[in-house]
A protein has these predicted regions:
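Extracellular/periplasmic catalytic domains that process cell-envelope and extracellular macromolecules
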Residues: 23-25, 80-82, 106-108, 120-124, ...
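Extracytoplasmic, non-cytosolic globular domains
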Residues: 116, 160, 164-255
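Structured beta-strand-rich core segments of catalytic domains in phosphoester-bond hydrolases
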Residues: 92-171, 175-179
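Bacterial Sec-dependent N-terminal signal peptides
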Residues: 1-24
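N-terminal, active-site-proximal structural segment of metallo-dependent hydrolase catalytic domains
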Residues: 20-111, 115-125, 303-311, 315, ...
Length: 341
C-alpha cells in the first residue's frame, strides 16, 4: 500500500511539473474590447457626458466598480484560469481606468504592467496593453497617429506599438488597434479604416526592412472582418501561414462560420476582433511558433445572455441606455504560441 501511495504521489508531482513546464514555454495572447470602460469623473476635454452619474446612462461609482469586477473575472478565466501573458484592451477612457482594471485582476503568479498613451479620440477612448513582466520585458512603446482623409478629419484612436523581449530572448512587436467604426455604413466608412491600415502597414514595413524576420503581432477591434479590404489587402494579413504577405491571420479560417465570432450583429457572429502575426511564426524553425488551431473567441458561458430575445449574445453593460450589468458587447479573442530556444 505504501508503495502504491508513493507511486501515486510521484505521478501527481510528475504531471504538475510538466504542466508547469509546458505553461512556461507557451505564450497566451488575447485582445478584449471592454465596452466603454469610463470612470465617473467629467473630463472637459472629451465627450464623456453619457458616462457620468447625472448623465444619460446614470454611470455611478457602484456601476463602475461592478464593471471592473466583471472584466477582471474574464481576464482571470482565460488560459485555463492562468490569465493571458499579453492582453490588448480597447474602449478604455484613460490610464486610470486601465490601471484599476490591472490592479483588480489579482492573478496568482502574475505581475501585469500597463502600456498606454492618451488618444485624441473625441470620446476619449484609448487602447492599451497589459503584459506580464515575467514573460515580456518592455523595451519600447509609442503611439502611432492615424490621420483620416477629408478636408476636416475628426481625430480617432491612435495605434499602440509596444516592443518587448520574451523569455527566450525573442524580440516581439505588438500593435494594439481600435479602428474607426462603421458609422454611416460599412462602405462609406471603409476609407477611414483603410487609413488606419495604411498607418500600421507603414510601421510593419519599416520593422521588416530593418529585420526581415521580425516577430510582429497585430491585435484589436478592427471594425472589419479578417476578409475585408483594410485588414487583409492593405495591412497585409492573409490566410497563408507562409505566404507572400507580411502577416498571417488565422481568424480568416473561422470567418465564414456565422456560429463563431467576437461580436454578434443581428443574430450573426462576426470576427471584427482578431489577431494576426508574422508569417514566419508558422515555420518550423521560428523561436515564436504559432500553435495551429489555437485562434478562437473566448466564449465563456457566463459572458452570454441566458434568456430573452438576445439569448446567446454577449451580455453587455448597456442596451441603449438600459443598464444590463453585464460584461461587454464583445468577446475576447486569443491565440497561443510555443516559445523555442
Amino acid at each position: 500500500m505504501r508503495i502504491f501511495y508513493k507511486t501515486l504521489l510521484f505521478s501527481v508531482l510528475f504531471l504538475i511539473y510538466f504542466s508547469a513546464s509546458g505553461q512556461s514555454n507557451r505564450l497566451f495572447v488575447a485582445h478584449y474590447n471592454v465596452e466603454n470602460l469610463f470612470d465617473t469623473i467629467d473630463d472637459p476635454k472629451t465627450n464623456d457626458e453619457e458616462f457620468l452619474p447625472e448623465g444619460k446612462n446614470k454611470w455611478t461609482a457602484e456601476r463602475y466598480a461592478h464593471k471592473i469586477g466583471r472584466l477582471s473575472q474574464v481576464v482571470r478565466a482565460m488560459n485555463a484560469g492562468a490569465g493571458p501573458d499579453l492582453l490588448g484592451i480597447c474602449e478604455i477612457e484613460n490610464r486610470q481606468v486601465a490601471d484599476e482594471l490591472r490592479k483588480s485582476i489579482h492573478q496568482k503568479g502574475r505581475n501585469y504592467i500597463l502600456a498606454h498613451f492618451e488618444s485624441p479620440d473625441n470620446r476619449g477612448i484609448d487602447v492599451g496593453l497589459l503584459y506580464d513582466s515575467k514573460k515580456f520585458k518592455l523595451l519600447h512603446a509609442q503611439s502611432l497617429t492615424v490621420i483620416l482623409p477629408g478636408e476636416k478629419p475628426w481625430p480617432t484612436r491612435d495605434v499602440l506599438l509596444v516592443t518587448g523581449q520574451l523569455k527566450n530572448k525573442t524580440r516581439l512587436h505588438v500593435f494594439v488597434n481600435h479602428w474607426p467604426s462603421r458609422s454611416g455604413g460599412q462602405e462609406k466608412s471603409e476609407i477611414n479604416r483603410m487609413a488606419a491600415a495604411k498607418t500600421v502597414r507603414r510601421a510593419i514595413d519599416s520593422l521588416l526592412k530593418v529585420d526581415p524576420t521580425a516577430h510582429i503581432l497585430t491585435m484589436g477591434d478592427f471594425n472589419d472582418g479578417p476578409a475585408d479590404i483594410a485588414p487583409r489587402q492593405i495591412m497585409g494579413a492573409d490566410s497563408l501561414p507562409n505566404g507572400p504577405s507580411p502577416l498571417y491571420n488565422p481568424f480568416l479560417a473561422l470567418n465564414s462560420d456565422t456560429t463563431q465570432g467576437s461580436y454578434n450583429y443581428r443574430g450573426s457572429w462576426q470576427f471584427i476582433d482578431h489577431i494576426s502575426m508574422s508569417t514566419h511564426t508558422s515555420s518550423s524553425n521560428s523561436k515564436l511558433k504559432y500553435l495551429a488551431g489555437s485562434a478562437k473567441a473566448e466564449k465563456f458561458d457566463f459572458l452570454l445572455e441566458k434568456e430573452g430575445r438576445y439569448a446567446g449574445n454577449p451580455w453587455r453593460t448597456y442596451a441603449g441606455s438600459n443598464y444590463l450589468g453585464g460584461y461587454s458587447d464583445h468577446l475576447p479573442v486569443s491565440v497561443q504560441f510555443e516559445l523555442r530556444k
